[in-house]
């Protein structure tokens, strides 16, 4: 479940690349934590919600969303026209970008189980990263979900 933080970090990075404020980014991180918990509880037995409020949960998520390589690369993606492979090559010095791989795997899982609608942030991040949806579309998500959370 720890890999899901990298997907959320893509969303946080889109916020940074667009120059959005801290409140928007914090809203994305908050929604992301909720979707991480829901995903793990939906698909893995024995998951305890309190785990997400420990160092391995929220603390790791915050660190990744505010300083990790997935955030950094997503910021570059949102800021201007490079493909993921170019960004990875130019910014990571041989390291791999895990968030994009995990994002694709998560979406494959959700589609196969008919659960995409239950994970609007994961779906939006996938749309931006792989389906050509503009990064600016991340901005409308927190307001659209406020009545559901």
Task: Indicate residue ranges for each PLM-predicted region.
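NAD(P)-dependent Rossmann-like dehydrogenase/reductase catalytic/cofactor-binding core
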Residues: 5, 9-27, 33-37, 41-149
């Amino acid at each position: 479940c720890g890999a899901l933080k990298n997907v959320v970090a893509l969303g946080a990075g889109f916020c940074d690349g667009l120059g959005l404020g801290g409140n928007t980014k914090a809203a994305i991180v908050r929604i992301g934590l909720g979707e991480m918990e829901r995903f793990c509880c939906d698909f893995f037995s024995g998951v305890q919600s309190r785990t997400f409020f420990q160092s391995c949960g929220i603390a790791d998520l915050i660190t990744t969303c505010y300083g990790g390589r997935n955030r950094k690369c997503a910021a570059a993606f949102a800021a201007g026209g490079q493909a993921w492979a170019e960004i990875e090559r130019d910014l990571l010095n041989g390291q791999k970008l895990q968030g994009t791989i995990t994002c694709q795997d998560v979406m494959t899982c959700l589609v196969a189980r008919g659960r995409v609608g239950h994970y609007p942030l994961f779906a939006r991040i996938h749309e931006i990263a792989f389906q050509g949806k503009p990064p600016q579309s991340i901005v409308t998500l927190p307001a659209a979900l406020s009545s559901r959370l």
